[in-house]
Amino acid sequence: MKGAGRGPSAGTGALCVLAASVLWGTTGTAATFAPDVGPLAIGAVAMGLGGLLQALAAARRTVRAAPRLRAHRGTVLLGAVSVAVYPLAFYSSMRLAGVAVGTVVSIGTAPLASAVIERVVDRRRLTRRWTLAACLGLLGTALLCVAEAAHASGGAGGRSVAGTLVGTGLGLVAAATYALYSWAAHRLITGGIPSRAAMGAVFGLGGLLLLPVLVATGAPLLDSWSGAAVGAYMALVPMFAGYVLFGWGLAHVPASTATTLSLLEPAVAAVLAVLVVGERLPVAGWTGIVLVVMCLAVLTVPTRAGAVVREEVTRPGHVPARAPTTGS
């Protein structure tokens, strides 16, 4: 597949996605420093300003790639709409169902959504290696979810069943849109468009779509230095820097692999909640983190042939020129 090389390039791509996931894992903890700012404002400032910064940083490349981007305008628009919907659903999910449940549902089910998209649209067949990694990661995130939800329900401020259900539903919307914009960006990149130009176009348009939401809900961000600092951090670090890294990663690994590697995010979020916010994580939660790490190891450890896995999916009927390294 064009744009997804073997060996070291795939390893570098995986590391870029993992680094992005670490940055994303800080967002839940950062948001706790601005408790008076609503989830729509947090999502709009994070992805909106972060997306516009990406567009500005990639402006020259985007202009040079404009003819090819216009030829794929449908994919660009799908990615941009998904970019706009994702943060609104994600942060609202965390506010309604809790940070643990919202993060785990949103990120933990994204690999399944990516797999469905690639199977239906690209007609790719999942391999045993990807399936094993996804099962480990989903089991780990489920344990994190159950452990932290049980711990939270033991406190005084339990959430309503209706709020939890709505929050979980919004988490599923976030997972689907995350998978969609990852797929769209990967499709543009592997179609010959430079990763910076593809990400700049998709996230720049998504940022423009989020500006009205930011104008309508963002006033509390300016009411205090802490709110402004959180907004600036969200836009610059996890969203701008994180998605630049994610774009580089998507140039070398499929969207299904990238979304599976990003299962590191809820594990990072849980650890930071313990170390920074002061939450307590039960044994089941730590077990979940270990399973997530095992999931990442399955995807990134070199195979017997000495190459790092680059595609955990194979096109049906395609006979590779050399033995595949995906364990299928």
Regions inferred by a protein language model and the residue ranges of each:
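Glycine-/small-residue-enriched transmembrane alpha-helix faces in small-molecule transporters
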Residues: 1-53, 81, 85-89, 151-187, ...
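Transmembrane alpha-helices of multi-pass small-molecule transport proteins
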Residues: 12, 36-85, 109-116, 176-181, ...
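Hydrophobic/aromatic residues within transmembrane alpha-helices
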Residues: 34, 42, 93, 120-122, ...
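Hydrophobic transmembrane alpha-helices of multi-pass small-molecule transport proteins
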Residues: 49, 54, 126-148, 155, ...
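Hydrophobic alpha-helical transmembrane segments of multi-pass membrane transport proteins
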Residues: 22-26, 30, 57, 77-96, ...
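C-terminal transmembrane-helix exit sites in multi-pass transporters
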Residues: 58, 110-135, 267-287
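Juxtamembrane helix-entry segments on the extracytoplasmic side of multipass membrane proteins
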Residues: 9-13, 35-44, 68-72, 131, ...
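Cytoplasmic-side transmembrane-helix entry/capping segments in multi-pass membrane proteins
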Residues: 14-17, 70-79, 125-139, 192-203
